[in-house]
A protein has these predicted regions:
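Positively charged, small/polar-rich N-terminal and surface patches that mediate targeting and assembly
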Residues: 1-115
Length: 115
């Protein structure tokens, strides 16, 4: 089994993504509100040196963007490619800036979930 972790910056597609996953028989997602380190520092820094550094990456950030969503899914190995396809379809592709990232980790033990 795998734990699929997705950091979704393009939060306006969250509902569509969940529906697409459900259409593929992928259920049981846990959704957490999250904020990236650079975004947090940019919005809260009073330090002039930090502000200078963060100003150089300002073009990469959208300070008006709401929080990201972190989506956690425990999947069977064979469901991973379908889940990633759903993410790519709904987001328009993770290769676009400020969309999100997805990765998996192995799950060696789990209790309390039925597949």
């Amino acid at each position: 089994m795998k734990l699929l972790i997705m950091i979704l910056n393009k939060v306006d597609v969250l509902e569509d993504l969940l529906l697409e996953l459900a259409n593929r028989q992928i259920k049981g997602a846990t959704i957490l509100s999250s904020t990236g380190m650079a975004h947090t520092l940019y919005n809260s820094s009073n330090d002039q040196e930090a502000s200078f550094f963060l100003g150089s990456i300002r073009t990469l950030l959208n300070p008006e963007r709401e929080e990201s969503k972190t989506i956690l899914l425990v999947l069977k190995e064979e469901q991973v490619s379908s889940a990633v396809e759903a993410v790519e379809k709904v987001t328009g592709g993770l290769d676009k800036p400020d969309t999100g990232i997805v990765f998996t980790l192995p799950v060696d033990y789990i209790k309390g979930i039925v597949f």
